[in-house]
Amino acid sequence: MDFAAMTMKNRKDLSPQCGINPCSSEWTWLMMRLKSMSAKGFAGDFKNFDGQEPSELQDALCTVVNNWYNDGPVNAQIRKVLIGEAFDRYTIVHNGVIHIQQGLPSGFVLTVIFNSWVNECYKYLAWLDLAPSSRKALVHCDEDVDSITYGDDNGHAVKEDTLVWFNLRTIGMFLSKHGITYTDEHKNHWSIAKPSVDIQSISFLKRLFVPHPDMPTFFKAPLEKKSIEERLLWVTESKFASPDELLQENIKNSMQDAYQWGPVYFSELRDKIEDALAEVGKAHLMSEISYTGEEMKWFETVPGVVDYAQSKFAQDVFGVGVARA
């Protein structure tokens, strides 16, 4: 768990972005980091990531983890066994026993951490294959490429001279030789996807990078609208909350994500939800979330703003008595 905590704590300097809060100023920092490397790049994904993940990489990552801990051979062996049981395991299905030799189960606490690092390993392995002989050393990869990963999602800012031979298509072709299917973030096969795009146009974690309407140097993280609206259509049965309580929570979450799209979409979605609830006599379930309130919450994530936000910030920026957008 210490290794997982280290990975999350140092995400500003590492590729894995586990622990990031997209609905904060962290999203701005992430885009600024990528743009500091290059204005061009690409975002990728994988088809059946777990099913194509080489167990050798998982084992190699365990060695990296052990080297990081450096706490003796006994603890190292314990970790090897525990992680080995995760990616090379037996499971019972009805009256049969199945042997699974690759991929990590979704319930395993380190799955997203390890998958994020495997994602990074794929980049380095592709570099070793694709780079000209004078640039094979991985230090050159770090000089020319800055990457972000989260599970099987990835984004790469690549210097334009390097993009000629290190891009989404060339990486996809390399990975295909090893039985791994690479796609862009929209699930288009590598062979038909654009080799590179404007780095600001990529999506990551199904979220875009959109300049704030009033402060274009800051970036919002709008989630695709389909994901925002679909959660309003159903709830998952729970022993701890009623269907109405679950729906109310879904409405709250959808409105929080709608804020990222700006005031127009926020108001449109709010009106649709209010009308739908009124039709079935459940108007009381509507969230009290306002666009102004969400804007203030977002501003409070910007370093240096918190103290000011608690005093004159709302009055100076939004005016007095603004309750709804």
Regions found by a protein language model. Give the residues of each.
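Extended, charge-rich low-complexity interaction segments
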Residues: 214-250
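A generic structural motif
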Residues: 15-25, 71-84, 136-137, 179-194
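Ordered core of a single globular domain
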Residues: 116, 120, 168-173, 258
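Short catalytic/ligand-binding loop motif for oxyanion handling, primarily in non-cytosolic enzymes
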Residues: 50-52, 213, 288
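Core catalytic machinery and nucleic-acid-binding channels of phosphodiester-processing enzymes
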Residues: 3, 7-64
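C-terminal, non-catalytic extensions of nucleic-acid polymerases
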Residues: 235-325
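Polymerase palm active-site segment centered on the conserved acidic dipeptide of motif C
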Residues: 160-226
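Conserved polymerase palm-domain catalytic core
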Residues: 37-150, 155-165, 201
